[in-house]
Amino acid sequence: MGSEALVHVFLVSFPGQGHVNPLLRLGKRLAAKGLLVTFSTPESIGKQMRKASNITDEPAPVGEGFIRFEFFEDGWDEDEPRRQDLDQYLPQLELIGKDIIPKMIRKNAEMGRPVSCLINNPFIPWVSDVAESLGLPSAMLWVQSCACFCAYYHYYHGLVPFPSEAEPFIDIQLPCMPLLKYDETPSFLYPTTPYPFLRRAILGQYGNLDKPFCILMDTFQELEHEVIEFMSKICPIKTVGPLFKNPKAPNSVRGDFMKADDCLEWLDSKPPQSVVYISFGSVVYLTQKQVDEIAFGLLQSGVSFLWVMKPPHKDAGLELLVLPDGFLEKAGDNGRVVQWSPQEQVLAHPSVACFVTHCGWNSTMESLTSGMPVVAFPQWGDQVTDAVYLVDVFKTGVRMCRGEAENRVITRDEVEKCLLEATVGPKAVEMKQNASKWKAAAEAAFSEGGSSDRNIQAFVDEVRARSVAITGKSTANGVALDLAEKSAEINGKVDLVETKTNGKVELVEA
């Protein structure tokens, strides 16, 4: 890995596709700036990543640094269905993680790779507790919009009124944000949310916000300027997005849980801006009736389409969705249905005209950065808030629905209307122009010297400054005491430093 030691950051991810992808992308950005990055998540996900993305145990060079993987057992059997219940899984993950992560940190130090910083994403705020116990600085990557971060912050601290059981239909006015209707705030905050465990999981991070020295966000300054400026006065925020754009990172270093189908050759055969791309992410599950209506709406519209239909997890207890009889035959070569796709490449393909999306933040950032208009089909969580921004603020989309709170099936006629509005006519032209402007702004942000690039460099510089020397027993790698005891012949104070010749941990006399 080279003769000169690299400052080492250790990333711990919640094992969800929407969490793994942005944190791994951040890891590649940090590695490209000359850091050694270790990415860690439970082995149950590591196994899927190895199979889908050809991940190996060898460090992969990225720019001036390297990225490597260390997965850990979460204490449950591979086919344990309780992983699908966050109320049960999150406490288990915390119990195991608080024990095994320190051991992994110490092992890395013993191997000559002392860790200088821990970084986690939402749902696992206890990682900052682990860092604190080891004397390590920590940071957190927020994987939703800054607008949603602001909403959760104000809800957690009770700073503005939110819908309640007594007043379920009130509007919400948050600082530097548009007025949100009761069903446009992140749905986990609804008083009647069917996902109270997700509300607890997200808000858990806000009880630990005083511990990370930096909150990194997968957004960019120009996209959410006002709310970023406001929240930056409260929290140490650095915008580092869009993370999925990284020209220095090899495509082989990916975090997909499923191997993508080869659909690019089919797209190559289609005229420019003629294909509608449909994907509802890794966790949204539609009803069979809704799938049928989308299918018939596609046929009525006559547009070409690429539709991602991911099968539900085997332990989720959900029925396998099927397409209407004769649907594929009627579509012919006009349509293609796959289980998973290389979304970044699909959105960048000249044949794709628009993106029918659930409006998760990863997909939102990818659509904006690719200059892709959207048809907004949010369901729950931050998706409903993201849809407001895509349609009303960024003006790159049309709205097909308002989310699960509507409690209705979107009809085939509504599907057809939205597809045509987003692909032909003056509205489609306007949306494409706006999307192209955001693409240019995103490219400027992540290019060398752009706002996000500067923030990543500033973060790297701060991590390096914090790791210059680690003194005495309060060592950032958690092993100074063990090493000092083995070096009893050294009198006086013992310092633990990382040398610049071989990256090994050495004890030197103070």
Swiss-Prot record:
It comes from the Eukaryota. An anthocyanidin binds at residues 19, 381. UDP-alpha-D-glucose binds at residues 343, 358, 361-363, 366, 382-383. It catalyses: 3,4,5-trihydroxybenzoate + UDP-alpha-D-glucose = 1-O-galloyl-beta-D-glucose + UDP; vanillate + UDP-alpha-D-glucose = 1-O-(4-hydroxy-3-methoxybenzoyl)-beta-D-glucose + UDP; 3,4-dihydroxybenzoate + UDP-alpha-D-glucose = 1-O-(3,4-dihydroxy-benzoyl)-beta-D-glucose + UDP. Its EC number is 2.4.1.136. Pfam families: UDPGT. Keywords: Glycosyltransferase, Transferase. InterPro entries: UDP_glucos_trans, UDP_glycos_trans_CS. One of its GO terms (molecular function) is gallate 1-beta-glucosyltransferase activity. The keyword Cell membrane does not apply. SUPFAM superfamilies: UDP-Glycosyltransferase/glycogen phosphorylase. PROSITE patterns: UDPGT. Gene3D superfamilies: Glycogen Phosphorylase B. The active site is at 19 (proton acceptor). Expressed in swelling buds and young leaves. Glucosyltransferase that catalyzes the formation of 1-O-beta-D-glucose esters with hydroxybenzoic acids as preferred glucosyl acceptors. Has the highest activity with 3,4-dihydroxybenzoate, vanillate and gallate in vitro. Gallate is the predicted native substrate of the enzyme, which thus catalyzes the formation of 1-O-galloyl-beta-D-glucose, the first committed step of gallotannin biosynthesis. Belongs to the UDP-glycosyltransferase family. PANTHER family: GLUCOSYL/GLUCURONOSYL TRANSFERASES, UDP-GLYCOSYLTRANSFERASE 84A1. This is Gallate 1-beta-glucosyltransferase. It comes from Quercus robur (English oak).
